[in-house]
Amino acid sequence: MQIDNLKNSKAIETLLPKYRANINDYVITLGGDKLLFTVELEGTSFTSVSDEELKTYFSSLDDFFLNLGKEYGGKLAIWTHIVKKRDELEQKYKFHSKFIQNFTDKYLSGFTNQNFFKTSYFITFVLKYNDLNDGLASCDSILAQANTLLNRYDGKLLSILDITDSVSICENNEFLSYLLNGTYQTITLNDSEVLDSVCNSDLFFNYDYFEIRNKESTISKYGTAYFLKSYPARTTLGMWDFLLELPYEFILSQSFIFTTAQKSIRAIEIQENKLSSSGDSATYQLEELEEARAYLSSGEIAFGDYQASILIFGETAKAAVDNGAKVISAFTDKGRGARWSRAAIESIYAFLSIMPDSKFRPLSSVRGSTSLVCGFSLHNYFSGKALGNPIGDGSAIMPLKTPTQGLYYLNTHYTPLKVNALGEFIAGHFLMLGATGTGKTTLEATIVAFLQRFNPQLFVMDYKRSTELYMRAYGATYFTFESGVDTGLNPFQLEEVASQDLLQFLYSWVISCSRDHNGLISDEDRMLIKEAVDAVMKLDIEERRFSMLLQVIPRSTPLYIRLRKWSHFEGGELAWIVDSPKNLFNPYDFDKIGFDTTTFLETQGHEGTEPLFSVLLYYKDLMKKSGRLLLSIVEEFYIPCSYPTTEQMIKRTLKTGRLTGEFLGLVSQSPADAIRSNIFEPIVEQTSTKIMLPNPDAEYKGSYERIGLSRKDFYLLKGLDKESRKFLVKQSGSSTLAHFDLSHCKEFLPIISGSTLGQQECEKIRSIYGDDPDIWIPLFLERMEEIKKEKAALKQNSQQNL
């Protein structure tokens, strides 16, 4: 193949349909008697949706085309396009923290020089009209009928968008331009004909390949073209879904020109005659045509002239030819018998056939509209939402890779793909479950790191100090509760003059310490508690503490007996939890704070769990500052959710947190226990995002089924190895597998994936150099690297001595 052999088709615009003008926001005029408009569809998450539901979607799409055929007959044509193109990570991430900037830069370096791909679906409607106004009304009617598709498949109408008061871009023109030029270009609304606006390349056609030389680029794009020669003998929904996994750019065009019933029957007869006289062993095709005639007569199917072409691209001529051969080979292996023919000297006509309303449609044949639906499944992999999200600047929290060479944009807030939800009060709570050793804390730390560019407040109730190192690195303060040591929590001293909100909390807080062995409390005891709290709050603020309640409650009452264990004055064994003489925490000053609650989480049924957690959650509510995001993470959340007071506090945050900008992360390494939580149903309902890490012991019935996972989701999750560094993300009805790999970020792992040794070394260094992350982090990482080398040397010496 020599470039010199290429033929220059400078006059290709003379062979293109006459795209005239943008007559309204979404319709383009064609020639003198046709109108054109396009919808873009992301598709449905077929790896998550049940097969039964996919069949329903298939039937609905089939009915949609059938009804259009009945209504418009030979006046309507449809061009569908499956477009797979390279995808790049374009978002830039800036942080104030040196550590986070360095860490995220290193993480994002894993996305450079990578081949990512994204698949999109398009349907272009070409309508012939007699009266322009009637034609436009028909376009409106077709669009109204297509609304179900737009909603189901995350679609949008390609239209004119106003960027400024004086500048508008034409999405529909840009799509035509992409088909012709092989690249997206911004096209603004102007007085030129649409055809003139979209023609921006010189095209050269060779026997084996074609070249697109864009006038605004010095880099050529190469492609090879194929016609569909033989359609599969037996079709089924999603029969070409294997294309979603192929790592090549392509445009698969399938056009369908509806015909009247009379013309369709005549066309079937002609095709029957051709098959009969050809001598080919095509008995099944003749049987299909006879069957089609019967369906056509009964109105159960719409017929038309069907044609398909595929353009496969590469960075060089050889790459294009090689990629084309691989794609066609995949059709041979998996395409249910579809036979493609390389266009060769007719490649220009294959190229032209992808343009909506092209008169060049080689190897077209009469087929039912169901055939079109089988090859245009609208199945796709869920890729998340890159822009237009509610928080920060609207960009996704962070990017992830998928096992199918795609990009996934992770968000905890879920909003429809095509809706710009920036600034809206949307629930962003998430549920994260995974067995021990699956990378849960590491993933959590990375998500929190990327969120720091939006400067959220942070509140964490931790287990085994798993978040301590990353919290301190992100500028948080962190406290550990030790058994027998005063917690420093004394809500009686929060306000000089107690607000009604504080009083109501104190009543419920003391009640949580006062229940009898059945977990109950009498109305009489409730009144005594209220009187005691009110009395304590009348004391000077420095005198207020839990023990002072017993100065008011009669000693002879059972309530007094039950409260003694919480009082230092009475030598109570649990006094260290609630009876601190001085409140050491001012929640109004909190910005980023974490508490290690291991002492309470490790002891099943610890009596201090409910009182302690309720104070912490109340302090969380008080720390929230207007206009700021607040991310609250509760590790092993099922434990606080098993107590009445804290259960209700968490439930309230789930329901109303969005109104104040709070989103809650409920995390557990014990999925079975978490799923048995008292309020698991509300948790599932209110958490818009479920992040499921591997769990080899997972069960579906009565367990992961309750999370809302489909059986397909569950089998994907169940098949993940604990060391796979993959996890499942579920949002709304869609899900995807994401790949999270920090193997190229090892120098940051001592903080992102902390250890007990790391916690100890961090304490030593901070005791000398202080808590400024910019100072202690470099010293800490250097020390951890030294320890790593020392261990390696010891291991080597021990092996040599064997």
Identify the meaning behind each predicted range.
Residues 44, 54-70, 242-244, 349-408, ...:
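P-loop NTPase motor domains
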Residues 402-403, 413, 417-427:
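Phosphate-binding P-loop
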Residues 443:
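Hydrophobic positions on the alpha1 helix immediately C-terminal to the Walker A/P-loop
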